[in-house]
Amino acid sequence: RLRLLNAGPSRFYEFYLVNSANVVQPFTYIANDGNLLPAPLLNQTRVRLGVAERGDIVVDFSRFALNTELYLVNRLTQTSTRGPGAVQAPGTRVMKIVVNRNPPVADVSRVPTALRAIRRPTAAEIAAAPVRRWVFSRRNGFWSINDKLINVNSAAARIELGGAEIWDLDNPSGGWAHPVHIH
């Protein structure tokens, strides 16, 4: 299991796992910012991460011969802080993995078919849910939400445990690509 985290302030990445000939190798995608997915996504070839996003992947290294070299590469171009550009191969190598079997015992672990149950709201709950609008803007080099700068000591919203709301996130700030993380 590899946890990939984009800890940068403005860069997007699109990661691929490739061998030394730049042939893409599949993996299983099991988690993102919201923790475990309901079920694993099998045979994935890429994971895109925005600012402060994470993705957990599982690679079955038993498929590879001892001393095989694999690389995590970024193929997403980005030349400005406003957002990503095109996907271009072969990409930039970010991490090298050399397959080793130490200790030399068989790994019998398996990714389960169900990772976690997620209770989905009913149509009636969605229809009755209150709507909050969050407008993101950027001025004088700072981001604001609903015309307010962030206050880390105050929650902007409080929702009853088990409650549901619809949040409308609007970023009319002229081409800035920026993921939103709700904590």
Give the location of each predicted region.
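Beta-strand cores of secreted/periplasmic/IMS beta-sandwich domains, seen most often
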Residues: 1-19, 53-76, 119-138, 152-182
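Eukaryotic Cys/His-coordinated zinc-binding finger proteins
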Residues: 142, 146-147
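Active-site-adjacent structural elements in folded domains
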Residues: 39-43, 148-155
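Extracellular/periplasmic ectodomains of large secreted or surface enzymes and adhesion receptors
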Residues: 96-140
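Histidine- and aromatic-rich segments of cupredoxin/plastocyanin-like copper-binding domains
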Residues: 1-114
